[in-house]
UniProtKB/Swiss-Prot annotation:
It is a multi-pass membrane protein. InterPro entries: Phos_trans_PitA_PitB, Phos_transporter. This is Low-affinity inorganic phosphate transporter PitB. It comes from Escherichia coli (strain K12). It catalyses: phosphate(in) + H(+)(in) = phosphate(out) + H(+)(out).
Length: 499
């Protein structure tokens, strides 16, 4: 691993290590901030002792990161404007990452201190938007162009819809349990709160099978949280390494000859598709703003711009850099690897835009999606040591600081305490919803999904909600995004003035 950092001066190397420490610290905060949601119900219902529940959550968080894949990781990264990603120098890259992470850390620590289940996902996304907007203002470019609106819209849709889904499904489960699993003394046990059970039976722990269901669903929430939120940390680490230590990370240096050939074949097949459908790139070119004029005085650094008009030239350059018998990326110089990454990202971006054009068949959309996946297979990756580091940070963070947010979830959302059935319904809803989102590559908020699910169970069960707590949570939700935008944007502007 250490040989990949060869070539960096001491100053840049120290800053790089500091940036990586920031990312892992952010993930640790994410662990004790968000994973409190996973253990709140299982602790409050006395299904597990707090210490054991937290260790279990840390364990399943760890394996959620390891097995969760990378689709969410790069969905977050692609929210940044493509030109900003491709043209940032090392110093600007560090300023961007430090500003983004510091803003997220400040807000997450603040909401955790007050016990508010605010969303780490919303915080991170707001920080990314703040960077994009500040970059647009400083460079004089369009604010609309500064944001990758396609990715931002898709991610915002998932963040808005997921809490509604959580509220409705969890409430629906309670309705079904009340309707079909009650009426007898034995069945009514799951609709009690721990204090009621202790008064009547002298026991505070739930019935055996109810307890098993609570533990399994809590483990599911922790695993899904790791699979979704852990990927965001992986994406941030890769963003740092690609920007600061490009020699070993801009492409997968461990890629096999087969994987490189698959990448080249995908580019060739995309070229054939464009040749068979010449009207599509023409439509796309007409929709895009013109390329910026090139500098002729030699004083301005030439920037790399993605534009559909350059697609065939870009494809030709890739085919030149990747001959058919290439077995490794080692023969390419660092500048060639960086150039290859930029070109591949641009070709992929063009492919994604083509798939969105009206008149493109479903079959062609699936073909373009498959080609994009193959093109980026050696570009969008993460070494095992990075996945392990993020998993450890999230797992360790889970075991500290969970109590504040867990008390809010378990005791302060509803006017009555949480019943066993409500805990099961909320956790099952969150585990399945977040797990599905991770599978399709959509970042969602564990906090929002589970908090909404708990609220849904309370409303349907007739217990009502504590207005003060719910108002505080909603205010935190509403202000998280603008606060993160202003924090990261302001920090980024200050950082750029100092360098």
């Amino acid at each position: 691993m250490l040989n990949l950092f060869v070539g960096l001066d001491i100053y840049t190397g120290l800053l790089l290590l500091l940036a990586l420490a920031f990312v892992l610290f952010y993930e640790a905060i994410n662990g004790f901030h968000d994973t409190a949601n996973a253990v709140a119900a299982v602790i409050y219902t006395r299904a597990m002792q707090p210490q054991l529940a937290v260790v279990m959550a840390a364990f399943f968080n760890f394996f959620g990161v390891l097995l969760g894949g990378l689709s969410v990781a790069y969905a977050i990264v692609h929210m940044l404007p493509t030109d900003l990603l491709l043209n940032m120098g090392s110093t600007h890259g560090l300023a961007m990452v430090f500003s983004m992470l510091l803003a997220a850390i400040i807000w997450n620590l603040g909401t955790w201190f007050f016990g508010l289940p605010a969303s780490s996902s919303h915080t991170l996304i707001g920080a990314i938007i703040g960077i994009g907007l500040t970059n647009a203002l400083l460079t004089g470019s369009s604010v609309m162009d500064a944001l990758n609106l396609r990715e931002v819209t898709k991610i915002f849709s998932s963040l808005i819809v997921s809490p509604i889904v959580g509220l409705v499904i969890a409430g629906g489960l309670i309705f079904l349990l009340r309707r079909y699993w009650s009426g007898t003394k034995k069945r009514d046990r799951i609709h009690r709160i721990p204090e009621d059970r202790k008064k009547k039976k002298g026991k505070r722990k739930p019935p055996f099978w109810t307890r098993i269901a609570l533990i399994v669903s809590a483990a599911g929430v922790a695993f899904s949280h790791g699979a979704n939120d852990g990927q965001k940390g992986i994406g941030l680490v890769m963003l740092v390494l690609v920007g600061i230590a490009p020699a070993g990370f801009v492409v997968n240096m461990n890629a096999s000859g087969y994987e490189i050939t698959r990448t080249r074949d995908a580019v060739t097949n995309f070229e054939h598709y464009l040749q068979q459908h010449p009207e599509l790139p023409q439509k796309l070119i007409a929709m895009e703003p013109p390329l910026p004029a090139a500098s002729t005085d030699g004083t301005q650094v030439t920037e790399f711009h993605c534009h559909p008009a350059n697609t065939f030239d870009a494809i030709a350059r890739v085919k030149t850099m990747l001959p058919g018998n290439m077995e490794s990326y080692e023969p390419l110089s660092v500048s060639q690897r960086s150039q290859l990454r930029r070109i591949m990202l641009c070709i992929s971006d063009t492919s994604a835009k083509l798939a969105k054009l009206p008149g493109v068949s479903k079959e062609d959309q699936n073909l373009l999606k498959k080609l994009r996946s193959d093109m980026l297979s050696t570009i969008e990756y993460a070494p095992v040591w990075i996945i392990m580091a993020v998993a450890l940070a999230l797992g360790i963070g889970t075991m500290i600081g969970w109590r504040r947010v867990a008390m809010t979830i378990g005791e302060k959302i509803g006017k009555r305490g949480m019943t066993y059935a409500q805990g099961m319904a909320a956790q099952m809803t969150a585990a399945v919803s977040i797990g599905l989102a991770s599978y399709i590559g959509m970042p969602v908020s564990t906090t929002h999904v589970l908090s909404s699910a708990v609220a849904g169970t309370m409303v349907v069960d007739g217990g009502g909600l504590q207005r003060k707590t719910v108002t505080s949570i909603l205010m935190a939700w509403v202000f998280t995004l603008p606060a993160a935008i202003f924090l990261s944007g302001g920090l980024y502007w200050i950082a750029l003035q100092l360098i």
